[in-house]
């Protein structure tokens, strides 16, 4: 299988966009894959993806899979099942869990990779807040795929790291964070209330602060 080729699960959010730039900086040939699994943010995500890829003039076209019926077997705020009486970002964050989402997405990406003879899959997971964003899960998924179809390397450089790591990479790679889209309540604009909007705004502020701090250091 192609050694320097990778299937990227791309959502147009900060994490997968920074991962896109990270992969490009390492000279990977990227095959972007976007999956519509019935998420409320589908339109905004796809619009952001198309803009980012157009600006980068990437070699390979985006493959978009429309599978909105997956929302019928899933649950949570991501597919419009909003919780009642939410009083904190932590409660909203917990409600956004779509059970088994990353296993589903990685399985589809692996199938696509098999067709293209690509043995690497990249996914922009950060930290370990959910079970399917941990290193343990990713390693188990590699083993499962090896038993199922072929050996794959799951590239997830930010797994297990705090978001600050992503922001530092975004600054280093000059990622246009404001071109990204992350909202779990609205279809094509940011609600500025959900956890994803909150995290995105916080990330942009940290990114700008990082730039100011480095500029101040360079003055000495």
Curated annotation (Swiss-Prot):
Enzyme Commission number(s): 6.3.4.20
Top-level taxon of origin: Bacteria
Cystine connections: none
UniProt binding sites for ATP: 10-20
Pfam families: QueC (PF06508)
Gene Ontology MF term list: ATP binding; ligase activity, forming carbon-nitrogen bonds; zinc ion binding
Pathway(s) the chain acts in: Purine metabolism; 7-cyano-7-deazaguanine biosynthesis
CDD domains for the chain: QueC-like (cd01995)
Catalytic activity reported: 7-carboxy-7-deazaguanine + NH4(+) + ATP = 7-cyano-7-deazaguanine + ADP + phosphate + H2O + H(+)
Residues that, per the record, bind Zn(2+): 183, 191, 194, 197
InterPro entries with a match to the protein in the record: QueC (IPR018317), Rossmann-like_a/b/a_fold (IPR014729)
Cofactor note: Binds 1 zinc ion per subunit.
One of the protein's GO biological processes: queuosine biosynthetic process
Cofactor: Zn(2+)
Subunit relationships: Homodimer.
UniProt record similarity statement: Belongs to the QueC family.
Name recorded for this polypeptide: 7-cyano-7-deazaguanine synthase 1
